[in-house]
Amino acid sequence: MVRVKRGNVARKRRKKILKLASGFKGAHSKLFRVANQQVNKSLRYSYVGRKLKKRRFRRLWILRLNAASREEGLNYSKLVNSLKLLRIQLNRKSLSQLAMIDNDAFKRLVASSRV
């Protein structure tokens, strides 16, 4: 039976981790053990961050919609409810962009939702 020495495999694995850790400060980018811990932690943070990004953008869109609709004398919840009753299926992102970019179209939309 031939003895298996894992030198190449281990070196590749360590190089991969150290490459991911490039840009970190101090030992976090130089020493394998510390870099491995930091890479694992940063990957967890980035995973959670991608989930939080969706929540934060939705909050931002709702906040913008509420501000824009209150200028027209209607609050956010009533606006969304009336749009739902009229079967206007625009999501919060596109409504928010409409309120920011094309304010006249948004005003017409709010006026049509009042009827």
Swiss-Prot record:
Q: Which molecular-function annotations from GO does this UniProt entry contain? A: rRNA binding; structural constituent of ribosome
Organism of derivation: Cyanidium caldarium (Red alga)
Q: Which family does it belong to?
A: Belongs to the bacterial ribosomal protein bL20 family.
Report the gene name. rpl20
Question: What keywords is this UniProt entry annotated with?
Answer: Chloroplast, Plastid, Ribonucleoprotein, Ribosomal protein, RNA-binding, rRNA-binding
Q: What are the GO cellular component annotations? A: chloroplast; ribonucleoprotein complex; ribosome
> What PROSITE patterns does the annotation carry?
RIBOSOMAL_L20
Where is this protein found? Plastid, Chloroplast
* InterPro entries membership: Ribosomal_bL20, RIBOSOMAL_L20_CS, Ribosomal_protein_bL20_C
Q: Name one Pfam family in it.
A: Ribosomal_L20
Instruction: Give start-end ranges for the coiled-coil region(s).
Output: none
Any GO BP? ribosomal large subunit assembly
**Role, per record:** Binds directly to 23S ribosomal RNA and is necessary for the in vitro assembly process of the 50S ribosomal subunit. It is not involved in the protein synthesizing functions of that subunit.
Name under which the protein is recorded: Large ribosomal subunit protein bL20c
The leader peptide range reads: none
